[in-house]
Structures are given as C-alpha cells and as structure tokens.
C-alpha cells in the first residue's frame, strides 16, 4: 500500500510540473498489479506451481487451490487451462496422497467444465474422464469421492460425446449404479439428479440413459432410494421427478402398484413436489 501511495504521489507531482513522466521500467510490478490487476494466466501458473512444490505447506497449497478454482470460474480462464498446459498437472493432483488436495482438484475440475463445452472437450482430450472414474473407484474418503462424482457429472451434462464415451471406460456405468445402490443421501442424490438432467436433454444422451435404465433397473433403484429417505423432502423430490420422466418414456419400476401407493403417501407429506396436474399425470401413467 505504501508503494502504491508513493507511486500515486509521484504521478501527481509529475502532472503539476513540466518534467517527463517516470520511466515505466522503473515501476514496481507489484504496484502495477495493484492498479491493473494481476494477469490471470500468471496467477494460474503460480497457483499450480505452489500446489506442486513440496516445500510449500499444505495450508498454503489449499489456498493456492482455492485461488485456482476461483480463477477458472471465469470461462476464459477455464479455457486457458489448455494453452497453459495445466490440464495434465491438474488431473495429476487426483493422485495426491493428501485427501484435501484430491478433493480440491476434483472441485476445480468440476468448476472448469461446468456448462463449458470447450473445457469439457479439453478434459476428454486429456483422458480426463477415464482418470476421474479411476479416482472414483480408488477414493476412500466420502467427502472427496463426492467431489470426484461432482466433477464427473459436471463433465457429462450437456455433453453427448462424453456420455457416448462411457461405454469405452471400463465399469463406468457400473460405478454410477453402485453409488445409486449405496443409498447415500448426498452421493446417490447427485447420481439421481444427473440421470434426471440426461432425461430432459433431447439428444442421444437421453436415449443412452433410457437404454441403461432397462439394463440396470435404474427406476427400481431410484424408487428404493426414495423409500429409504422418505422423510427427506429433497431426496424424495429428486427421486420422484426422475421416476416421472422414466415413466413418461415407458421405463418403470417392476411393481407399479407399490409405487402408486407410495405416491399417495408422498403426496400427503410433500404436496408441493408436483403441481396438481403433474400428480394426476403421474398417477394416470402408472395405472
């Protein structure tokens, strides 16, 4: 701050005299950063360098990751991960011995690819989907595993190429179904909402999820999750909305009569999950 004030005073003095302005080469770069803002590309490089530096304490690495994640919230910065050659380095952090760094790496990846087709493609080109599923399989921390799952679903939403690629990644669908069967209130709900997102897309992704729904009995598993978490309105809401879309596409649970009975109970407890017309349409589709 003192340097910034001194520089401001110098400029003001120069403006009130006939002397030439100060030579730009003499200006302190830190002062210019205060005035104009640091270059995001440089900040991204510095953050990754700090994350990789073994001499940097863990808490400082976490701060560097937070900075990187905030930077890639801006789509241009996210897309600059390619020319800066940061994708391989970022993905490598999914193998860090520190669970915190693995979690922050997954979070940063999710932020970079979310609603960003260019970054989604860049992740694919860096073998990122395969790496993410490998991390999902090996991860033993639920908190970190949830962030890896978040990165996967962020990459695959509105991404036909990514969905089509899943059949080439060993056991990718099986891993998603395994999480669905866990009935974990957070991770399972994320998978269910991901399936819902695919069902509202009018593209090949929708056809693929309908095919997988038959193959893995997905509606049945979603229904069982709703029963397991029947007092949790958000879990029930996401489950029923997803089941409704499956039903509209003629993919249903094995026992529709049981689902009909459950709908009556859910409607009495959470009437605002659907509109009156939607409740009626769901009932009629099951009858």
UniProtKB/Swiss-Prot annotation:
Recorded superkingdom: Eukaryota
Regions of compositional bias (Polar residues) in chain numbering: 7-20
ARM repeats (start-end): 75-114, 117-157, 160-200
Chain positions covered by the region annotation Disordered: 1-30
Cysteines engaged in disulfide bonds, as pairs: none
GO biological process: cytoplasm protein quality control by the ubiquitin-proteasome system; regulation of translation
Keywords: Cytoplasm, Nucleus, Phosphoprotein, Repeat, Translation regulation
Matches recorded under InterPro entries: ARM-like, ARM-type_fold, Hsp70_NEF-Inhibitors, Nucleotide_exch_fac_Fes1
Role of this protein: Functions as a nucleotide exchange factor (NEF) for Hsp70 chaperones which accelerates the release of ADP. Required for fully efficient Hsp70-mediated folding of proteins.
Protein name per its UniProtKB record: Hsp70 nucleotide exchange factor fes1
């Amino acid at each position: 701050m003192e340097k910034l004030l001194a520089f401001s005073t110098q400029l003001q003095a120069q403006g009130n005299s006939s002397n030439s302005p100060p030579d730009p080469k003499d200006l302190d770069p830190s002062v210019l950063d205060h005035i104009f803002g640091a270059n995001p590309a440089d900040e991204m490089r510095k953050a990754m360098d700090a994350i990789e530096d073994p001499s940097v304490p863990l808490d400082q690495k976490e701060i560097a990751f937070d900075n990187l994640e905030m930077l890639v919230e801006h789509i241009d910065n996210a897309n600059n991960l390619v020319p800066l050659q940061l994708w391989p380095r970022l993905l490598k952090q999914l193998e860090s011995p520190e669970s915190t760094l693995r979690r922050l790496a997954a979070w940063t990846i999710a932020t970079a690819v979310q609603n960003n087709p260019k970054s989604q493609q860049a992740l694919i080109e860096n073998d990122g989907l395969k790496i993410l599923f490998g991390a999902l399989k090996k991860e033993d921390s639920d908190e970190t595993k949830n962030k890896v799952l978040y990165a996967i679903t962020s990459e695959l939403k509105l991404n036909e190429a990514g969905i089509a690629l899943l059949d080439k990644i060993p056991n990718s669908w099986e891993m998603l179904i395994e999480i669905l069967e866990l009935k974990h209130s957070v991770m399972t709900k994320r998978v269910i909402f991901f399936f819902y997102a695919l069902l509202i897309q009018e593209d090949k992704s929708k056809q693929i999820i309908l095919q997988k729904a038959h193959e893995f009995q997905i509606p049945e598993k979603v229904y069982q999750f709703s029963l397991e978490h029947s007092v949790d309105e958000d879990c029930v809401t996401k489950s029923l909305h997803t089941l409704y879309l499956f039903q509209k596409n003629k993919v249903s649970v094995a026992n529709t009569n049981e689902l009909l009975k459950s709908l009556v109970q859910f409607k009495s407890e959470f009437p605002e999950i659907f509109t009156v017309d939607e409740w009626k349409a769901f009932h009629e589709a099951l009858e």
